[in-house]
Protein backbone atom coordinates (compact mmCIF):
# COMPACT_ATOMS: atom_id res chain seq x y z
CA UNK A 1 0.00 0.00 0.00
CA UNK A 2 2.95 2.34 0.55
CA UNK A 3 5.15 4.01 -2.01
CA UNK A 4 8.90 3.52 -2.29
CA UNK A 5 10.36 7.00 -2.66
CA UNK A 6 14.00 7.72 -3.32
CA UNK A 7 16.09 9.55 -0.72
CA UNK A 8 15.62 13.02 -2.28
CA UNK A 9 11.83 12.75 -2.34
CA UNK A 10 11.65 11.17 1.12
CA UNK A 11 13.67 14.05 2.58
CA UNK A 12 11.35 16.67 1.04
CA UNK A 13 8.21 14.81 2.11
CA UNK A 14 9.41 14.30 5.71
CA UNK A 15 10.34 17.98 5.96
CA UNK A 16 6.72 18.77 5.06
CA UNK A 17 4.94 16.43 7.49
CA UNK A 18 4.87 13.07 5.70
CA UNK A 19 6.02 9.87 7.41
CA UNK A 20 6.31 6.22 6.32
CA UNK A 21 3.08 4.21 6.67
CA UNK A 22 1.04 7.42 6.67
CA UNK A 23 -2.64 6.61 6.10
CA UNK A 24 -5.37 9.21 6.48
CA UNK A 25 -9.13 9.00 6.31
CA UNK A 26 -10.28 10.36 2.95
CA UNK A 27 -14.06 10.27 3.40
CA UNK A 28 -14.25 14.06 3.03
CA UNK A 29 -12.28 13.93 -0.25
CA UNK A 30 -14.49 11.08 -1.46
CA UNK A 31 -17.63 13.11 -0.70
CA UNK A 32 -16.35 16.23 -2.47
CA UNK A 33 -15.35 14.28 -5.57
CA UNK A 34 -18.68 12.44 -5.72
CA UNK A 35 -20.59 15.72 -5.37
CA UNK A 36 -18.67 17.14 -8.33
CA UNK A 37 -19.07 13.94 -10.40
CA UNK A 38 -15.39 13.00 -10.41
CA UNK A 39 -14.37 9.34 -10.39
CA UNK A 40 -12.11 8.40 -7.45
CA UNK A 41 -9.89 5.75 -9.03
CA UNK A 42 -7.66 3.35 -7.06
CA UNK A 43 -4.49 5.29 -7.84
CA UNK A 44 -5.99 8.54 -6.57
CA UNK A 45 -7.38 6.82 -3.49
CA UNK A 46 -3.94 5.44 -2.60
CA UNK A 47 -2.40 8.85 -3.28
CA UNK A 48 -4.86 10.58 -0.94
CA UNK A 49 -4.47 7.95 1.80
CA UNK A 50 -0.71 8.43 1.83
CA UNK A 51 -0.16 12.03 0.69
CA UNK A 52 -3.53 13.76 1.05
CA UNK A 53 -3.59 17.02 2.97
CA UNK A 54 0.12 17.69 2.61
CA UNK A 55 1.37 21.08 1.51
CA UNK A 56 4.86 20.56 0.10
CA UNK A 57 7.46 23.29 -0.34
CA UNK A 58 9.97 22.27 -3.01
CA UNK A 59 12.34 23.58 -5.66
CA UNK A 60 10.62 25.89 -8.14
CA UNK A 61 10.15 24.84 -11.75
CA UNK A 62 11.62 28.03 -13.20
CA UNK A 63 14.43 28.74 -10.72
CA UNK A 64 16.28 26.14 -8.63
CA UNK A 65 17.13 28.89 -6.13
CA UNK A 66 13.46 29.62 -5.51
CA UNK A 67 10.68 27.52 -3.98
CA UNK A 68 7.20 26.52 -5.00
CA UNK A 69 4.32 24.85 -3.18
CA UNK A 70 2.26 21.80 -4.15
CA UNK A 71 -0.93 21.12 -2.23
CA UNK A 72 -2.32 17.57 -2.31
CA UNK A 73 -6.08 17.60 -1.84
CA UNK A 74 -8.96 17.75 -4.32
CA UNK A 75 -10.95 20.60 -2.79
CA UNK A 76 -9.70 23.51 -4.90
CA UNK A 77 -9.53 21.75 -8.27
CA UNK A 78 -12.90 20.05 -7.75
CA UNK A 79 -14.43 23.46 -7.02
CA UNK A 80 -12.71 25.17 -9.95
CA UNK A 81 -13.01 22.64 -12.79
CA UNK A 82 -16.05 21.19 -14.47
CA UNK A 83 -15.54 17.43 -15.00
CA UNK A 84 -17.02 17.76 -18.50
CA UNK A 85 -14.31 20.27 -19.38
CA UNK A 86 -11.63 17.95 -17.92
CA UNK A 87 -12.97 15.13 -20.09
CA UNK A 88 -13.01 17.20 -23.28
CA UNK A 89 -9.64 18.88 -22.75
CA UNK A 90 -7.57 16.25 -20.93
CA UNK A 91 -9.18 12.81 -20.66
CA UNK A 92 -9.84 12.59 -24.40
CA UNK A 93 -6.09 13.00 -24.99
CA UNK A 94 -5.03 10.04 -22.83
CA UNK A 95 -8.24 7.97 -23.11
CA UNK A 96 -8.46 7.54 -19.32
CA UNK A 97 -10.50 9.07 -16.53
CA UNK A 98 -8.69 11.54 -14.31
CA UNK A 99 -9.16 12.41 -10.67
CA UNK A 100 -8.01 15.85 -9.47
CA UNK A 101 -5.59 15.44 -6.56
CA UNK A 102 -4.15 18.89 -5.96
CA UNK A 103 -2.66 22.12 -7.21
CA UNK A 104 0.79 23.62 -7.66
CA UNK A 105 2.81 26.37 -9.30
CA UNK A 106 1.06 29.25 -7.55
CA UNK A 107 -2.18 27.30 -7.92
CA UNK A 108 -2.02 27.64 -11.71
CA UNK A 109 -1.60 23.91 -12.41
CA UNK A 110 -4.05 21.21 -11.35
CA UNK A 111 -2.66 17.75 -10.65
CA UNK A 112 -4.49 14.57 -11.66
CA UNK A 113 -4.03 10.83 -11.17
CA UNK A 114 -5.23 8.60 -14.00
CA UNK A 115 -6.85 5.18 -13.76
CA UNK A 116 -3.51 3.57 -14.68
CA UNK A 117 -1.65 5.54 -11.99
CA UNK A 118 -0.06 8.21 -14.16
CA UNK A 119 0.35 11.70 -12.70
CA UNK A 120 -0.63 14.62 -14.92
CA UNK A 121 -0.74 18.39 -14.78
CA UNK A 122 -3.13 20.74 -16.49
CA UNK A 123 -3.21 24.50 -16.86
CA UNK A 124 -5.92 25.82 -19.15
CA UNK A 125 -5.21 24.21 -22.54
CA UNK A 126 -1.76 22.94 -21.49
CA UNK A 127 -1.72 19.27 -20.42
CA UNK A 128 1.35 17.25 -19.48
CA UNK A 129 2.56 13.95 -18.08
CA UNK A 130 4.59 14.53 -14.93
CA UNK A 131 5.24 10.86 -14.11
CA UNK A 132 4.14 7.34 -15.05
CA UNK A 133 3.73 6.56 -11.36
CA UNK A 134 3.68 8.51 -8.11
CA UNK A 135 7.30 7.75 -7.22
CA UNK A 136 8.68 9.08 -10.53
CA UNK A 137 6.15 11.90 -10.49
CA UNK A 138 7.27 13.37 -7.19
CA UNK A 139 10.94 13.23 -8.18
CA UNK A 140 10.08 15.01 -11.42
CA UNK A 141 7.75 17.50 -9.73
CA UNK A 142 10.17 18.37 -6.92
CA UNK A 143 13.51 18.22 -8.75
CA UNK A 144 13.83 17.22 -12.40
CA UNK A 145 11.00 19.25 -13.98
CA UNK A 146 10.93 17.21 -17.19
CA UNK A 147 7.21 17.38 -17.95
CA UNK A 148 6.03 15.86 -21.23
CA UNK A 149 3.57 18.09 -23.08
CA UNK A 150 0.66 16.08 -24.46
CA UNK A 151 -1.09 18.70 -26.57
Predicted regions and their residues:
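Short, compact, well-ordered microdomains
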Residues: 119-126
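Compact, glycine/acidic-enriched structural inserts
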Residues: 127-151
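Short acidic-glycine loop/turn motifs at beta-strand connectors
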Residues: 113-116
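A surface-exposed partner-binding patch
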Residues: 1-108, 149
